[in-house]
Design a protein with these regions (language model features):
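Polar helix-capping/helix-linker motif
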Residues: 7-8, 21, 70, 98
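Exposed, low-complexity/repetitive linear segments and helix-based recognition motifs
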Residues: 6, 26-27
């Protein structure tokens, strides 16, 4: 067989292979991409005390990347600047930033990185993950209510409760009795900016 026919045959085979692979590559790249609207989102906390202490974090970032359109492939990443704590009281904020609590000089970030997503029912989703504060990492759970399914925009609002003493926060604030249980409230609003809709199982 002439050499040019062998070369043409090889080129044709490579072309066919490329044509067959390109659609799958394109599909693999099609995942939902969401952007969080910081202006309308909040991360808050409260702890029962002789007077309940409530506060927010003014500086934080959150992402929700997907590896497919299936909700359970999402990964929730939250990074909070601990020094941005805001209770409305300079004395309390200073105490919380100090070494007895957040210890922001040594460990400036509070983070949550999800490792598993479970749909509980049509409106409730649990994110199991690693929670880190003061350089101590432990497994915790964020339980969210999901709204706006199928609209391209929505909200996930959830809570996580942890024992502050598990993370080395054993002391209190002068003249204030503080409970051990701390509740974190995460309210994220965002929209899908590209990719297919998220697929929910329920």
């Amino acid at each position: 067989m002439p050499e040019r026919f062998l070369l043409n045959g090889t080129r044709f085979a490579l072309l066919c292979l490329l044509i067959s692979v390109l659609p799958s590559l394109s599909q693999a790249q099609e995942v939902p991409v969401f952007e969080v609207n910081h202006a309308d989102s909040t991360i808050k906390f409260n702890v029962k005390a002789s007077v309940t202490i409530e506060g927010t974090f003014d500086k934080w970032d959150a992402g929700l990347p997907f590896t497919s359109s299936d909700l359970e492939t999402a990964v929730l990443d939250i990074k909070i600047q601990a020094a941005s704590v805001n209770t409305g009281s300079g004395m309390k904020d200073g105490k919380l930033r100090g070494k007895d609590f957040f210890n922001v000089k040594e460990d400036p970030l509070i983070t949550f990185h999800s490792t598993k997503v479970v749909e509980i029912d049509a409106t409730t989703t649990e994110f199991d993950g690693d929670f880190t504060i003061r350089g101590v990492t432990k497994p915790e759970k964020l339980t969210f209510t999901v709204t706006g399914k199928g609209t391209g925009a929505g909200e996930i609002k959830g809570t996580m409760a942890f024992d502050r003493k598990d993370y080395g926060m054993n002391k209190g604030i002068p003249f204030v009795t503080i409970a051990d249980r701390v509740e974190v409230i995460v309210d994220l609003k965002g929209e899908r900016v590209s990719g297919p809709p998220v697929v929910f199982k329920q």
